[in-house]
UniProtKB/Swiss-Prot annotation:
Pathway: Cofactor biosynthesis; thiamine diphosphate biosynthesis; thiamine phosphate from 4-amino-2-methyl-5-diphosphomethylpyrimidine and 4-methyl-5-(2-phosphoethyl)-thiazole: step 1/1. HAMAP family: TMP_synthase. Mg(2+) binds at residues 67, 86. Binds 1 Mg(2+) ion per subunit. Its cofactor is Mg(2+). This is Thiamine-phosphate synthase. 4-amino-2-methyl-5-(diphosphooxymethyl)pyrimidine binds at residues 34-38, 66, 105, 134. The gene is thiE. Belongs to the thiamine-phosphate synthase family. It comes from the Bacteria. Its EC number is 2.5.1.3. GO terms for cellular component: cytoplasm. Condenses 4-methyl-5-(beta-hydroxyethyl)thiazole monophosphate (THZ-P) and 2-methyl-4-amino-5-hydroxymethyl pyrimidine pyrophosphate (HMP-PP) to form thiamine monophosphate (TMP). One of its GO terms (molecular function) is magnesium ion binding.
Amino acid sequence: MTLPRRVLCVITDEHSNPVELARMALQGGAGMVQLRRKTASGQELYEWAIRIQALCSEQQALFIVNDRVDIAMAVHADGVHLGQQDLPASAARALLAPDAIIGVSVSNATEAIKAAEEGASYIGVGHIFPTFSKDKPSEPLGTASIRPIGRAAQLPVIAIGGIGHDNAAEVIRAGASGIAVISAVSDSDDPETATRELVRRIRQ
């Protein structure tokens, strides 16, 4: 399965109804939805995942699950996104369908190369700008990091961290294949319109 160019990945937050957020993001043109809820039970994630997978299928968008390979397998999601402390990409690749999309979060070239060697489909590079989505964020990498890290891995880059309407196009110009956002959509009064505007910015 191939990652679309200039894709917008909307990640569910810790507070919104993930199914409704996914629905509005898809109506706004998101090409990928990632289910992420660190505090949810396996049962909750499974039930949400079934419904979001159906919504994504209707819109011909990709659906990936954060961390939980078992949930991704159970609902036949398009793939998973893994952090540095999660199951290695190679282990996830052995469990999932051969064409599954596997993303790995990285913050430097060493991690990026390792992700590529383990079979990642793309790397999530960040955080690019200051962000409030993490409890104790490190220093932002900046847009200048995108191209070198992507070249080191020879993989598509989805940039994340502090990305919104004002800087989305800049991130794409810096070499990212796409962007991932949380608060830029979830904190909006109109998530559908916020998504549509982000899509317009990264494709202009």
